[in-house]
Amino acid sequence: MSRSAKILLILLAAGLLCFGALEGAVLAGCHDEVTHDADVVIVLGAKLWPDGPSPALKRRLDKALDYVSTHPNAEIIVSGGQGHDEYTSEAQAMADYLLERGCASERIHLEDKATSTAENLRFSMAVMRSLGYDPVETPVAVVSNDFHLTRTRLLCRRLGLTADTLGASMPDLKSAFYSYNREAFALLKDLLFY
């Protein structure tokens, strides 16, 4: 075997090991972490479909509805901007979904500028401040899909947000496979650059 082939093989093996470690971290974090009753529930946005929230986003919203049904004083921040191919902001579509399911409008607050998970959290912290909450001291629960919880926890820690995390399962195997594999690379990006 030539020297360049050996180097290529070593690099390939190192890349596979790195991907395996990242995927292991994603999988290990796919569980709810609930340690307190939240005063604020932040629901992270996701891509909209032409007729409203995607199935994965609906699951996030349903998870949030389940939580707030047993926490009647918790306020909800729905976070997500408007993508170039989306008919409205993710936050507005999420608010509409919650309202259609009987959630009181005074409990729902929109953060409609975020375009990334880090922005979802950072901008939602600003909404919390505008509502009179201290993001560092206030009990918070962040809702996303289960594949996304490891990175969500990492970003919360880096932003100083002490938050529980609630994960909704993915609606089907195909989207789960894609999301879990994509998340390993997103985790690497945030580990290195955020």
Model-derived segments and their meaning:
Residues 176-194:
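A transmembrane-helix-recognition feature enriched in membrane-embedded lipid enzymes
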Residues 1-39:
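N-terminal membrane-anchoring alpha-helices
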Residues 13-16, 69, 102, 191:
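Generic low-complexity, intrinsically disordered sequence content enriched
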Residues 23, 27-180:
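A structural signal for short, hydrophobic/glycine-enriched beta-strand patches
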Residues 2-5, 59, 188:
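Short, intrinsically disordered low-complexity segments
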